Amino acid sequence: MNNLLSVQDAACYLHISSSTLYRWVHCKKIEYVKIGSRVLFTKESLEIFIQNNTITPN
């Protein structure tokens, strides 16, 4: 489970608040893993999210 990040750790990794991340989970804007009641994230899915939301200049 070392490659899974908690909401708090993932939010810190993305430089956003935990509440923003929970909102994205609720809206299914970001990929996550649910184990019981825990919401977790892989670093790989966070990297993909960052790549998919990167805006490059013209």
For the regions a protein language model found, what residue spans apply to each?
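A short, Lys/Arg-enriched interface patch at domain edges and termini
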Residues: 46-58
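Polyanion-binding surface elements
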Residues: 1-20
